[in-house]
A protein has these predicted regions:
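Short glycine-rich, low-complexity segments
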Residues: 1-86, 94-135
Length: 135
């Protein structure tokens, strides 16, 4: 259950960050910000780097890291805690589950998606910008 102190539509900084990430991923636009935060206006270490994804991990209001199956197949037990924002509409975010390939090492996209109410998220951690095939 979400903390009641942050369960209204005006108290959702995680949702706001997800909106910014979604816009950046959709437009992959250059910017002038020098802050190394989730809302940095370009991907990678410089504006000329060709990345298309800012992977994130999310934490629920009880402090648990969110994990989802990497496949939609019944009985799938392999889970991931790394996601790509695909779409966001007010307080609902559609996220793609990313799988980590330790041999490469890189993230790969999956066909596993889920929609979450961002009101029930209390923390976000942005991982290093990357290029993900098959988006």
């Amino acid at each position: 259950m979400c903390d009641n102190s942050c369960s209204n539509k005006t108290c959702n900084c995680v949702g706001e960050v997800l909106i910014v990430i979604c816009i950046l991923q959709n437009e992959v636009c250059p910017g002038t910000s020098c802050l190394e935060t989730c809302t940095k206006a370009y991907f990678g270490p410089s504006e000329s780097t060709e990345f298309n994804t800012r992977p994130v991990t999310l934490y629920t209001c009880n402090g648990t890291k969110l994990e989802m199956p990497i496949s939609n197949l019944p009985g799938e037990e392999t889970k991931s805690d790394v996601f790509r924002v695909e779409k966001i509409n007010e307080c609902c975010a559609t996220l793609r589950v990313l799988s980590y390939d330790s041999c490469a090492p890189k993230y790969t996209s999956t066909n596993s998606f889920f929609t979450i109410d961002t009101i029930c998220l209390c923390a976000i951690k942005c991982l290093g910008d990357t290029y993900v095939d098959c988006i």
